[in-house]
């Protein structure tokens, strides 16, 4: 029998200290990592329920374990809400992550050695889009497209040329660091020219898609994948969506279970269902609109201060800051901002002369700061602080400026708490 009065703090003070310290960090630091966000207390609560105890291999109504009648209800709700939210005919809510969702799609639609055409990691793609260090670049013959060096935009002519040359089995559209709107239909047309499947990875913009602020790829692509966190603001996890195609649906289900996973995480699936319901509210659309407004305000301020943004600005929630030619690297900028309690991530930029461990850029995103209540005024102020640190790095007197900015960050964070007590 469990002791219901027992607390984590009393039983495991080391873990409790880690949890508390991370909570403080989230409250006292400004989070600008584009893939991070703060989930609602409801989403967090669902993940701490007794659903975590239940094994449920299989799918609703067709399980390999007994006693699944109630977790079936949770998963069925998650599936129907996902389909409604994104206009999909099919949804699989079991993938544990976006990468595992992508892995399942590769397994369902391609065979080892098949050619896959995806966006280069160095130009804003994702590891699972064919990077050599990833399964997608090891098991499959990965061909990579990128950005036009003059415009900083996806070079659709290059995509078409590569598709005609290599005849891929699947084309992957999507990104982890691209600030403009992708033309899903152009990708569809190119895929149709060569008889390829089209997979869209909308992990970064799923929240914007749900709110109607970014084109919806679900009825254009053969298969669409996403994370359920990032802009969508749900629990950490993945999802697969598709338009009606019974053959592909069967392949996708088999690729997730038993192909790649065993028991689904029912407590996380319940949290996904809650986040999908949250995404159907008017307040959620207001939030996503503010995410884009904040990103545009930050990009404009960077440009005004003489800092280059890849692609010349942003039409979504993120931007890639190009530091090529600066005496400091992306790693230097990341570390300096971290000392001021501003969290970003170093990121390679197109034609980056530095190594992936150093880089010449940083990626900046607005989902988390918008969740805590920042609007354009705070974002402009914050961007100017970042530019002040950049200028100080260039001048060689960063320490004093970092301390000044750190004090201002502390004040701003107190004004905009993430989780008010």
Swiss-Prot record:
One of its GO terms (molecular function) is glycine hydroxymethyltransferase activity. One of its GO terms (biological process) is tetrahydrofolate interconversion. It is found in: Cytoplasm. Keywords: Amino-acid biosynthesis, Cytoplasm, One-carbon metabolism, Pyridoxal phosphate, Transferase. Disulfide bonds: none annotated. GO terms for cellular component: cytosol. Pfam families: SHMT. Its cofactor is pyridoxal 5'-phosphate. It catalyses: (6R)-5,10-methylene-5,6,7,8-tetrahydrofolate + glycine + H2O = (6S)-5,6,7,8-tetrahydrofolate + L-serine. Pathway: One-carbon metabolism; tetrahydrofolate interconversion; Amino-acid biosynthesis; glycine biosynthesis; glycine from L-serine: step 1/1. Gene3D superfamilies: Aspartate Aminotransferase, domain 1, Type I PLP-dependent aspartate aminotransferase-like (Major domain). Its EC number is 2.1.2.1. The record marks 229 as: Plays an important role in substrate specificity. It comes from the Bacteria. InterPro entries: PyrdxlP-dep_Trfase, PyrdxlP-dep_Trfase_major, PyrdxlP-dep_Trfase_small, Ser_HO-MeTrfase, Ser_HO-MeTrfase-like, Ser_HO-MeTrfase_PLP_BS, SHMT-like_dom. CDD domains: SHMT (cd00378). The modification N6-(pyridoxal phosphate)lysine is found at residue 230. (6S)-5,6,7,8-tetrahydrofolate binds at residues 121, 125-127, 355-357. The keyword Transcription does not apply. Catalyzes the reversible interconversion of serine and glycine with tetrahydrofolate (THF) serving as the one-carbon carrier. This reaction serves as the major source of one-carbon groups required for the biosynthesis of purines, thymidylate, methionine, and other important biomolecules. Also exhibits THF-independent aldolase activity toward beta-hydroxyamino acids, producing glycine and aldehydes, via a retro-aldol mechanism. HAMAP family: SHMT (MF_00051). Belongs to the SHMT family. NCBIfam families: PRK00011.1. Homodimer. This is Serine hydroxymethyltransferase.
């Amino acid at each position: 029998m469990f002791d219901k009065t027992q607390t984590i703090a009393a039983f495991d003070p080391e873990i409790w200290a880690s949890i508390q310290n991370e909570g403080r960090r989230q409250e006292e630091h400004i989070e600008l990592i584009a893939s991070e966000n703060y989930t609602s207390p409801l989403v967090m609560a669902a993940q701490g329920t007794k659903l975590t105890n239940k094994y449920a291999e299989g799918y609703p109504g067709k399980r390999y374990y007994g006693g699944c009648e109630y977790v079936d209800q949770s998963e069925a709700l998650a599936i129907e809400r996902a389909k409604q939210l994104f206009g999909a005919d099919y949804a699989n809510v079991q993938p544990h992550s976006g990468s595992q969702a992508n892995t399942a799609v590769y397994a369902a639609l391609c065979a080892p050695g098949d050619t896959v055409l995806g966006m280069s990691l160095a130009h804003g793609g994702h590891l699972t889009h064919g990077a050599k260090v990833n399964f997608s670049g090891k098991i499959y013959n990965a061909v990579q497209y990128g950005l036009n060096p003059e415009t900083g935009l996806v070079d659709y002519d290059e995509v078409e040329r590569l598709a005609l040359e290599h005849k891929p089995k699947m084309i992957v559209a999507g990104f982890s660091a691209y600030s403009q709107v992708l033309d899903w239909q152009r990708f569809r047309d190119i895929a149709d020219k060569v008889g390829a499947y089209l997979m869209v990875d909308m992990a970064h913009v799923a929240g914007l898609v749900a709110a109607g602020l970014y084109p919806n790829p679900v009825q254009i692509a053969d298969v669409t994948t996403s994370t359920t966190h990032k802009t969508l603001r749900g629990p950490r996890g993945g999802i697969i969506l598709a338009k009606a195609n019974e053959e592909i649906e069967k392949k996708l289900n088999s690729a997730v279970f038993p192909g790649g996973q065993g028991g689904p995480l029912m407590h996380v699936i319940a949290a996904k269902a809650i986040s999908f319901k949250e995404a159907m509210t008017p307040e959620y659309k207001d939030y996503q609109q503010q995410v884009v407004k904040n990103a545009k305000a930050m990009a404009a301020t960077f440009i005004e201060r003489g800092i280059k943004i890849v692609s010349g600005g942003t039409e979504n929630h993120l931007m890639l800051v190009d530091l090529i030619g600066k005496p400091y690297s992306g790693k230097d900028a990341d570390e300096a901002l971290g000392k001021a309690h501003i969290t970003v991530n170093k990121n390679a930029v197109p034609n980056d002369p530095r190594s992936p461990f150093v880089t010449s850029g940083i990626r900046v995103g607005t989902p988390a700061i918008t969740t805590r209540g920042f609007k354009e005024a705070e974002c402009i102020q914050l961007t100017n602080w970042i530019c002040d640190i950049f200028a100080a790095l260039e001048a060689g007197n960063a320490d004093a400026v970092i301390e000044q900015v750190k004090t201002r960050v502390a004040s701003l964070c107190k004004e905009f708490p993430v989780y008010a007590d």
